[in-house]
Amino acid sequence: MNHLIILVVAAVFLGMASAEDVFHKRFTVSCLCASDGPSVHGNKLTGTVAVGGCNPGWHKCNTEHNVLYECCKKN
């Protein structure tokens, strides 16, 4: 019985982790990092908009100061 509970908890945990990855891939907005160049024409937007600030493991990648969001790039 204990093995079954552990198996169910592990399956739920793995399901939540993969659901978070899917959400991040589908619902992200790209932004222009300082390393992308002076304009968006022909350049890839390598940053991701993060509401309220960059998440752990990410860093702010431009020089703009916004109250609601930051342009972040994964370390």
UniProtKB/Swiss-Prot annotation:
Disulphide bridges: 31-71, 33-61, 54-72
Chief place of localization: secreted
CC per GO annotation: extracellular region; nematocyst
Gene3D superfamilies referenced in this protein's UniProt entry, alphabetically: Anthopleurin-A (2.20.20.10)
Cleaved propeptide residues: 20-26
Compartmental location: Secreted; Nematocyst
Highest taxon above the source species: Eukaryota
UniProtKB keywords: Disulfide bond, Nematocyst, Secreted, Signal, Toxin
Residues annotated as signal peptide: 1-19
Similarity field: Belongs to the sea anemone sodium channel inhibitory toxin family. Type I subfamily.
Protein function: Toxin that is lethal to crab.
Protein name: U-stichotoxin-Hau3a
Organism from which the protein derives: Heteractis aurora
